[in-house]
């Protein structure tokens, strides 16, 4: 396996020890490469070269077998079902250091450091809106832009809306990598994807509504992603010229 994706999860269980037991029980049919405890202690359960069962039914940028191309990191946090606690700073420092270490061994583009909810928006919420994606990005892990400010007024795309503006947003979400049909109808699947996007990139308000803040943040992510790919391509071409 040559992973080109990192997927971050929360355990969603009352305590880390119980999560570790579950992840190490063959009959549970769930596993991950790493588990990061609240105090920053890291346990590796599966070698990075081997496939772990952490993604489930999922999709990103045309890929449906996420388990075969990703490294899964479980973060000990009881999640939405148990009070939605904050992530301790030392735990986030450990997650960041682990991801940076993985990036030295594998080529993982920033936009392929993802939440479980990004790749399975209809099923999953983790690691949730309290996960500090900006902190990771500031350390060179993942993709982040400053969210566009939330303002009252403007066009709001909500369940049942139809039209070109809906189709345009669906197309942009699909281009970024999400599993979404460009139908022009704001259906429940679109609502789930928008909610997942907000959890990751616009966590100030999670409502599944395609407001101007959400759409502007998405457009800036796409623009920045395009610039990063252009710079990477130029660097690759220069490297080829230098060695030819």
Give short role names for the model-derived ranges.
Residues 56-59, 88-114, 120-244:
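Cell-envelope/ECM-targeting effectors and their regulatory/trafficking segments
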Residues 4-111:
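Active-site-adjacent loop/helix surface patches within enzyme catalytic domains
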Residues 78, 119-120:
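Short acidic/polar capping segments at secondary-structure boundaries
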């Amino acid at each position: 396996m040559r992973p080109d994706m990192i997927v971050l999860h929360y355990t969603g269980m009352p305590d880390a020890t119980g999560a570790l037991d579950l992840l190490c029980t063959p009959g549970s049919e769930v596993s991950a490469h790493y588990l990061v405890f609240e105090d920053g202690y890291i346990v590796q359960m599966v070698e990075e070269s081997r496939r772990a069962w952490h993604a489930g039914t999922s999709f990103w940028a045309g890929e449906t077998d996420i388990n075969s191309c990703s490294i899964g990191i479980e973060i000990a946090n009881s999640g939405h079902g148990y009070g939605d606690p904050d992530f301790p700073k030392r735990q986030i420092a450990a997650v960041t250091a682990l991801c940076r270490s993985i990036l030295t061994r594998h080529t993982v583009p920033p936009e392929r450091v993802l939440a479980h909810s990004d790749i399975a928006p209809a099923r999953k919420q983790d690691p949730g809106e309290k996960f500090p994606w900006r902190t990771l990005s500031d350390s060179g892990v993942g993709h982040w832009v400053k969210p566009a400010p939330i303002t009252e007024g403007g066009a709001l795309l909500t369940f049942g809306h139809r039209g070109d503006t809906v189709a345009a947003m669906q197309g942009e979400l699909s281009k970024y990598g999400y599993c979404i049909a460009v139908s022009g109808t704001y259906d429940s699947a679109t609502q789930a994807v928008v909610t997942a996007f907000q959890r990751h990139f616009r966590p100030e308000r999670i409502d599944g509504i395609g407001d101007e803040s959400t759409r502007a943040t998405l457009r800036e992510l796409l623009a920045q992603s395009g610039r990063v790919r252009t710079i990477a391509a130029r660097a690759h071409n220069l490297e080829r010229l230098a060695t030819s």
